[in-house]
């Protein structure tokens, strides 16, 4: 009678021994794959793996049990810690997006986002960097408000960029003396973010902030407590489409938003792209109006304000 063939051994999820840096990297990848899988609705690590195997079987290849916890339970601690931390970080970073979608839909959106674009940085600061792209790629999570949510994700990421990007020595009026406008190239501060939006999300964000500050404010009597609770529960009305140009900037470590005239936006964007001052002005002002006295006064006012805000820098 022919000998029965043994079934093929199951491929290991993680290396059995760590004898090299390659083995260590494989073990780390296996652990990351396990703990970064989304939690169940009960906030537990799934009991079954994608191929139907018990997750405990895979966990045993990564972590040893101890006298208190199984291998599965030990890894579940890391999984829950990871998911609670990254979800909480995005929750705090995206108040406008959360207000526009409502908390249940927002939580589903960011979980789906983290599955496709998990953290790849040592800092949580970079976690929302690809959220606007994801909203465009997967509109099913934000319909029928995808365009608004895309603007909000861009705006809220811009605020993060502004907060800790570099600030260079400012460009002063003295630096303009004897300069030829045809050759002069100004530089904008690295932290300055210029946004062309389809919705007035700057006003929406401010309304959300005011609502949240009222709901968090300390109340000293029953009437104030009641008012704070009503404010917290109140929804901020989603804005209607309106072409909007905004500069997000900072002064003394505080972030500000400044509305821009479309022509002012075009001038600043041209400067940001490395155009000369003359080219930037041509890009911003229609040829038929570039000698109009009103436009000259308007442009002078813009540049005076931008200089006062320290938007131009030396490089």
Place the predicted regions along the sequence by residue.
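Low-complexity, glycine/alanine/valine/leucine- and proline-rich hydrophobic stretches
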Residues: 192-273
């Amino acid at each position: 009678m022919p000998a029965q063939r043994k079934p093929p051994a199951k491929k290991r999820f993680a290396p059995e021994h760590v004898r090299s840096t390659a083995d260590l990297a494989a073990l780390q990848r296996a652990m990351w794959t396990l703990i970064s899988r989304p939690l169940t609705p009960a906030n537990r690590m799934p009991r079954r793996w994608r191929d139907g195997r018990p997750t405990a079987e895979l966990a045993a290849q990564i972590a040893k049990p101890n006298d208190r916890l199984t291998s599965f339970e030990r890894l579940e601690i890391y999984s829950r810690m990871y998911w609670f931390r990254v979800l909480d970080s995005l929750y705090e970073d995206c108040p406008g997006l959360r207000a526009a979608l409502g908390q249940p839909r927002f939580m589903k959106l960011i979980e789906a986002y983290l599955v496709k674009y998990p953290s790849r940085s040592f800092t949580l600061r970079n976690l929302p960097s690809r959220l606007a792209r994801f909203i465009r790629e997967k509109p099913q999570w934000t319909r029928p408000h995808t365009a608004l949510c895309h603007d909000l994700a861009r705006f809220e990421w811009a605020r993060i960029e502004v907060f800790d990007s570099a600030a260079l020595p400012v460009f002063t009026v003295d630096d303009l003396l004897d300069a030829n406008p045809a050759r002069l190239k100004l530089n904008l501060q690295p932290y300055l973010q210029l946004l062309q939006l389809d919705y007035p999300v700057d006003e929406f964000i401010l309304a959300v902030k005011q609502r949240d500050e009222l709901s968090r404010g300390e109340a000293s009597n029953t009437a104030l407590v009641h008012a704070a609770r009503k404010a917290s529960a109140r929804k901020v009305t989603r804005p209607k489409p309106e072409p909007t140009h905004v500069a997000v900037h900072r002064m003394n470590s505080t972030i500000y938003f400044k509305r821009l005239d479309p022509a002012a936006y075009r001038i600043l964007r041209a400067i940001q792209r490395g155009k000369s001052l003359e080219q930037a002005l041509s890009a911003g002002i229609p040829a038929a109006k570039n000698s109009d006295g009103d436009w000259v006064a308007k442009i002078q006012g813009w540049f005076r304000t931008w200089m006062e805000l320290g938007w131009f820098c030396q490089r």
